[in-house]
Amino acid sequence: MNTYKNSLNHFLNLVDCLEKIPNVGKKSAFKIAYHLGLENPYLALKITHALENALENLKTCTSCNALSESEVCEICSDESRQNSQLCMVLHPRDVFILEDLKDFLGRYYVLNSIEEVDFNALEKRLIEENIKEIIFAFPPTLANDSLMLYIEDKLQHFHLTFTKIAQGVPTGVNFENIDSVSLSRAFNSRIKA
């Protein structure tokens, strides 16, 4: 016997796909699919077009690993930014969050993972841009503390100042879950790592 759901394969496939997005549960995925499929198909087409364009044009900056639509991102190519400070973050989305604060006028370096770090390229960048301070903007965890120590050890011969954003960012919490006032206060109160 066929069930009602068996006749809605395409719709249910859309719900399943939407449910794979972080922080979107089954109920939210159903509501989004229903809205896009029945209530606002024009928006669905706009989203489809925006996704195609993003997938076609999105890449990572060859200098800092942040998201970009060109080989070098706007931040790295901006001559007015302070060259003496390099803010290290874990993920490209962290650059968005910190840029929204408008507290940091230097440049960034996105780690993604320690295995992917090209220390030769990073060292070249430290010299070329005359970096004097590395700011670790990582959520406070024991693993991230170890990561900071590892990076400090690898770059100690540059005699840099290493700082980290101040505590006040709760341990184990990602930036997207912190209010902007707390994150701004923590960033402006950074301390020597």
Swiss-Prot record:
Zinc finger C4-type: from-to: 61-76
Role, per record: May play a role in DNA repair. It seems to be involved in an RecBC-independent recombinational process of DNA repair. It may act with RecF and RecO.
Encoding gene per record? recR
What GO molecular function annotation could you give as one example from this UniProt entry?
DNA binding
In this protein, which residues make up the domain named Toprim? 84-170
Which family would the database say this protein is a member of? Belongs to the RecR family.
From which domain of life does this come?
Bacteria
Native organism:
Helicobacter pylori (strain HPAG1)
**CDD domains per the UniProt record, alphabetical:** TOPRIM_recR
Q: Per UniProt, which keywords does this protein have?
A: DNA damage, DNA recombination, DNA repair, Metal-binding, Zinc, Zinc-finger
Write down what this protein is called: Recombination protein RecR
Q: Which Gene3D superfamilies match?
A: 3.40.1360.10, RecR Domain 1
Which GO terms fall under biological process for this protein? DNA recombination; DNA repair
Instruction: Give the source lineage, highest ranks first.
Output: Bacteria, Pseudomonadati, Campylobacterota, Epsilonproteobacteria, Campylobacterales
Tell me which InterPro entries the record gives. Answer: DNA_Rcmb_RecR (IPR000093), Rcmb_RecR (IPR023627), Rcmb_RecR_Znf (IPR015967), TOPRIM_dom (IPR006171), TOPRIM_RecR (IPR034137)
